[in-house]
Curated annotation (Swiss-Prot):
GO terms for molecular function: serine-type endopeptidase inhibitor activity. Keywords: Disulfide bond, Protease inhibitor, Secreted, Serine protease inhibitor, Signal. Disulfide bonds join 31-81, 40-64, 56-77. Serine protease inhibitor. SMART domains: KU (SM00131). It is found in: Secreted. Its main location: secreted. It comes from Notechis scutatus scutatus (Mainland tiger snake). Residues 1-24 form the signal peptide. It comes from the Eukaryota. Residues 31-81 form the BPTI/Kunitz inhibitor domain. This is Tigerin-4. The record marks 41-42 as: Reactive bond for trypsin. One of its GO terms (cellular component) is extracellular region.
Amino acid sequence: MSSGGLLLLLGLLTLWAELTPVSSKDRPKFCELPADSGPCRGILRAFYYHPVHRTCQMFIYGGCYGNANNFKTIDECKRTCAA
């Protein structure tokens, strides 16, 4: 297979991996944690996975501590937690 063909195959596999939803059994446990702004007083837009609504939602993060259910972008949240 040519290098162009290998690059195309690699690109398609990467795209498939990005677009394949996470099943609930593969979802990390931290996706079930509530949004946690932490004790600091920053005003940073962040996203968390809301397990009841099964969506990623925005919240205000204080900038320190909190928990692992905290993402800089909604796309990162969806890739990690959304089914």
